Amino acid sequence: MQIELAKTAASRPATAFAIVANVVDWPEIISSIKSIEVLTPGPIRAGTRLREDRIIFGRGLTQELEIATIERPHRLRLLANHPDLHYELDHVIDAVYGGGCRMMLIFRSRPATPTGRALQPLMSPFMEITLRDELERDLPDLATAISRHGPN
Protein backbone atom coordinates (compact mmCIF):
# COMPACT_ATOMS: atom_id res chain seq x y z
CA MET A 1 0.00 0.00 0.00
CA GLN A 2 1.22 3.50 -0.77
CA ILE A 3 -0.29 6.85 0.23
CA GLU A 4 1.02 10.19 -1.04
CA LEU A 5 -0.02 13.63 0.18
CA ALA A 6 1.42 17.06 -0.65
CA LYS A 7 1.07 20.62 0.62
CA THR A 8 2.85 23.86 -0.20
CA ALA A 9 4.35 26.26 2.32
CA ALA A 10 5.79 29.76 2.05
CA SER A 11 9.34 28.89 3.06
CA ARG A 12 12.66 27.94 1.53
CA PRO A 13 13.26 24.17 1.30
CA ALA A 14 16.25 24.39 3.66
CA THR A 15 14.15 26.12 6.34
CA ALA A 16 11.30 23.64 5.87
CA PHE A 17 13.66 20.70 6.08
CA ALA A 18 15.27 22.00 9.27
CA ILE A 19 11.83 22.03 10.92
CA VAL A 20 10.83 18.60 9.60
CA ALA A 21 14.17 16.99 10.51
CA ASN A 22 14.09 18.33 14.08
CA VAL A 23 12.13 15.29 15.25
CA VAL A 24 12.51 16.12 18.95
CA ASP A 25 10.20 19.13 18.39
CA TRP A 26 7.46 17.09 16.70
CA PRO A 27 5.28 16.91 19.85
CA GLU A 28 5.03 20.73 19.74
CA ILE A 29 4.26 20.70 15.99
CA ILE A 30 2.21 17.58 15.20
CA SER A 31 -0.90 17.43 17.36
CA SER A 32 -1.20 13.62 17.34
CA ILE A 33 2.37 13.10 18.62
CA LYS A 34 2.54 13.24 22.40
CA SER A 35 6.26 12.54 22.88
CA ILE A 36 9.48 11.61 21.09
CA GLU A 37 12.36 9.92 22.89
CA VAL A 38 15.69 9.67 21.10
CA LEU A 39 17.11 6.22 21.88
CA THR A 40 20.44 6.58 20.06
CA PRO A 41 23.08 8.88 21.60
CA GLY A 42 24.51 11.67 19.50
CA PRO A 43 23.06 13.89 16.80
CA ILE A 44 20.04 12.94 14.69
CA ARG A 45 21.34 10.99 11.68
CA ALA A 46 20.69 7.88 9.62
CA GLY A 47 20.47 5.00 12.08
CA THR A 48 19.06 7.08 14.94
CA ARG A 49 16.29 5.20 16.76
CA LEU A 50 13.28 6.98 18.24
CA ARG A 51 10.36 6.04 20.45
CA GLU A 52 7.21 7.88 19.43
CA ASP A 53 4.00 8.12 21.47
CA ARG A 54 1.04 9.27 19.43
CA ILE A 55 -2.71 9.06 19.16
CA ILE A 56 -3.71 7.09 16.07
CA PHE A 57 -7.11 5.63 15.28
CA GLY A 58 -8.27 7.34 18.49
CA ARG A 59 -5.94 5.24 20.66
CA GLY A 60 -2.49 5.68 22.16
CA LEU A 61 0.32 3.99 20.26
CA THR A 62 4.00 3.68 21.15
CA GLN A 63 6.30 2.66 18.34
CA GLU A 64 10.00 2.55 17.65
CA LEU A 65 11.17 4.23 14.49
CA GLU A 66 14.53 4.42 12.79
CA ILE A 67 15.78 7.28 10.68
CA ALA A 68 16.77 5.45 7.52
CA THR A 69 17.75 8.40 5.36
CA ILE A 70 18.54 12.08 5.78
CA GLU A 71 19.28 13.91 2.53
CA ARG A 72 19.46 17.59 3.50
CA PRO A 73 17.48 19.65 2.52
CA HIS A 74 15.30 17.24 0.58
CA ARG A 75 14.34 14.00 2.32
CA LEU A 76 13.83 12.37 5.72
CA ARG A 77 12.80 8.70 5.71
CA LEU A 78 11.58 6.85 8.80
CA LEU A 79 11.23 3.08 9.08
CA ALA A 80 9.11 1.03 11.45
CA ASN A 81 9.46 -2.73 11.69
CA HIS A 82 6.56 -4.20 13.62
CA PRO A 83 6.05 -7.96 13.85
CA ASP A 84 3.00 -7.74 11.56
CA LEU A 85 3.73 -4.72 9.37
CA HIS A 86 6.80 -2.93 8.03
CA TYR A 87 6.38 0.63 6.83
CA GLU A 88 8.33 3.63 5.60
CA LEU A 89 7.35 7.28 5.87
CA ASP A 90 9.15 9.73 3.62
CA HIS A 91 9.09 13.49 4.19
CA VAL A 92 10.16 15.00 0.85
CA ILE A 93 10.65 18.74 0.34
CA ASP A 94 11.07 20.39 -3.06
CA ALA A 95 11.39 24.00 -4.17
CA VAL A 96 8.37 25.50 -5.92
CA TYR A 97 8.83 27.79 -8.92
CA GLY A 98 8.19 31.36 -7.79
CA GLY A 99 9.15 30.68 -4.17
CA GLY A 100 8.15 28.46 -1.33
CA CYS A 101 8.28 24.71 -1.13
CA ARG A 102 6.18 21.61 -1.51
CA MET A 103 6.23 19.04 1.24
CA MET A 104 5.15 15.47 0.53
CA LEU A 105 4.41 12.64 2.92
CA ILE A 106 4.78 9.25 1.27
CA PHE A 107 3.70 6.22 3.31
CA ARG A 108 4.55 2.70 2.10
CA SER A 109 3.71 -0.50 3.93
CA ARG A 110 4.07 -4.20 3.42
CA PRO A 111 2.87 -7.08 5.57
CA ALA A 112 5.59 -8.97 7.41
CA THR A 113 3.86 -12.32 7.86
CA PRO A 114 2.13 -14.83 5.56
CA THR A 115 -1.17 -14.12 7.33
CA GLY A 116 -0.69 -10.39 6.79
CA ARG A 117 0.03 -10.93 3.12
CA ALA A 118 -3.12 -13.05 2.78
CA LEU A 119 -5.26 -10.42 4.54
CA GLN A 120 -3.76 -7.41 2.74
CA PRO A 121 -6.24 -7.34 -0.16
CA LEU A 122 -9.14 -7.31 2.31
CA MET A 123 -7.66 -4.88 4.85
CA SER A 124 -5.87 -2.39 2.59
CA PRO A 125 -8.93 -0.32 1.60
CA PHE A 126 -9.92 0.22 5.24
CA MET A 127 -6.36 0.83 6.43
CA GLU A 128 -5.70 3.24 3.57
CA ILE A 129 -8.70 5.42 4.42
CA THR A 130 -7.79 5.59 8.10
CA LEU A 131 -4.05 6.13 7.53
CA ARG A 132 -4.75 8.80 4.92
CA ASP A 133 -6.92 10.60 7.50
CA GLU A 134 -4.08 10.46 10.03
CA LEU A 135 -1.51 11.75 7.52
CA GLU A 136 -3.92 14.49 6.42
CA ARG A 137 -3.84 15.74 10.02
CA ASP A 138 -0.03 15.59 10.31
CA LEU A 139 0.73 17.38 7.04
CA PRO A 140 -1.07 20.67 7.84
CA ASP A 141 0.55 20.72 11.28
CA LEU A 142 3.99 20.53 9.66
CA ALA A 143 3.05 23.07 6.96
CA THR A 144 1.81 25.52 9.61
CA ALA A 145 5.08 25.25 11.55
CA ILE A 146 7.05 25.76 8.34
CA SER A 147 4.96 28.76 7.25
CA ARG A 148 5.45 30.40 10.67
CA HIS A 149 9.11 30.81 9.74
CA GLY A 150 8.14 32.72 6.60
CA PRO A 151 9.80 32.81 3.21
CA ASN A 152 13.36 33.32 4.57
Across the structure, where does each feature detected by a protein language model lie?
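Hydrophobic ligand-binding cavity/cleft-lining segments
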Residues: 1-45, 141, 147, 152
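Well-ordered beta-strand positions
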Residues: 8, 68-69, 94-95
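Beta-strand elements of well-folded, non-transmembrane domains
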Residues: 11, 58, 109-113
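Short, flexible segments with low predicted structural confidence
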Residues: 15, 38-39, 64-65, 106, ...
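Glycine-rich portal/gate segments that line the openings of hydrophobic small-molecule binding cavities
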Residues: 38-88, 100-102, 137-152
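Beta-strand/loop substructures that line and gate deep hydrophobic ligand-binding cavities in soluble
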Residues: 79-133, 137, 142
